[in-house]
């Protein structure tokens, strides 16, 4: 534009438009930076909560273990027998297929979500579930998992059910999205809820996709697989010995 010429309307609007675009871009960038900083602070705070809960659970587990030892020693000193509380949790593994299976046990296996051989699920022991386990006892192995078994299963083989999809538990956010309303926001919360059979056990166990285990190291042995555990076979209740089987299949 020549010197001394009065600027036209278009000459004025062009730089104003550019300034507005720059201002909008600056505002968007500032908003993104603020949101990122807020998210980082929130995540740091959540990490503190998760760490604190994990510490609390460790303390709780250790105190429970020490109490068991104390009660056993006390019973021994008094010349009596220590009778532990009835187990509330079992881990159930399907070990046989559908060949020659009657409709009723087949339906129960579906109800327990044991759709395939080597599928495993956590089950709360009630009068009703005990009856279901009795019906399908010739097709399953089950028992009382310890804390180590629960933790190893969830960390190594754990998948969540999200929108009917099998999703790896690679991020605590997946757990929080599904179970946060029950106060379960991380892996250790999930493990604690399962192991202690907490108030949200049903929701937690249903969130976990049935575990897909391997054949036990060394195999089942054809004859052993079709006999009850107390007869030297593989089916039925093996109580605490389920932990050795979990280790062999995990």
From Swiss-Prot:
Pfam families, sorted: Ribosomal_L30 (PF00327), Ribosomal_L30_N (PF08079)
Molecular-function GO terms, alphabetical: RNA binding; structural constituent of ribosome
ATP-binding keyword on record: no
One BP annotation, GO: maturation of LSU-rRNA from tricistronic rRNA transcript (SSU-rRNA, 5.8S rRNA, LSU-rRNA)
InterPro entries noted in UniProt: Ribo_uL30_ferredoxin-like_sf, Ribosomal_uL30, Ribosomal_uL30_CS, Ribosomal_uL30_euk, Ribosomal_uL30_euk_arc, Ribosomal_uL30_ferredoxin-like, Ribosomal_uL30_N_euk
Assigned GO CC terms: cytosolic large ribosomal subunit
Record key words, sorted: Ribonucleoprotein, Ribosomal protein
Cited Gene3D superfamilies: Ribosomal protein L30, ferredoxin-like fold domain
Entry similarity comment: Belongs to the universal ribosomal protein uL30 family.
Protein's name in the database: Large ribosomal subunit protein uL30
Organism: Yarrowia lipolytica (strain CLIB 122 / E 150)
């Amino acid at each position: 534009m020549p010197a001394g010429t009065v600027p036209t309307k278009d000459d004025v609007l062009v730089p104003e438009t550019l300034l507005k675009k720059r201002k909008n871009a600056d505002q968007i960038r500032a908003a993104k930076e603020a949101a990122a900083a807020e998210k980082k602070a929130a995540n740091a705070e959540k990490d503190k909560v998760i760490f604190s809960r994990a510490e609390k659970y460790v303390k709780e587990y250790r105190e429970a273990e020490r109490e068991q030892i104390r009660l056993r020693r006390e019973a021994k000193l008094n010349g009596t027998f220590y009778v532990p509380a009835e187990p509330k949790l079992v881990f159930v593994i399907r070990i046989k297929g559908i060949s020659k299976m009657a409709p009723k046990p087949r339906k129960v296996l579906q109800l327990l979500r044991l759709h395939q051989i080597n599928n495993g699920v956590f089950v709360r022991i009630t009068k009703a579930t005990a009856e279901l386990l009795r019906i399908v006892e010739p097709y399953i192995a089950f028992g009382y998992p310890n804390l180590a078994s629960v933790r190893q299963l969830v960390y190594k083989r754990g998948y969540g059910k999200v929108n009917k999809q099998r999703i790896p538990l690679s991020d605590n956010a997946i757990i929080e999205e599904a179970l946060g309303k029950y106060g379960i926001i991380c892996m250790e919360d999930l493990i604690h809820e399962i192991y202690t059979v907490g108030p949200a056990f049903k929701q937690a166990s249903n969130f976990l996709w049935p575990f897909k285990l391997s054949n036990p190291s060394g195999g089942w042995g054809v004859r052993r697989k079709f006999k009850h555990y107390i007869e030297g076979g593989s089916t039925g209740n093996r109580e605490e010995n389920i932990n050795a089987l979990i280790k062999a299949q995990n």
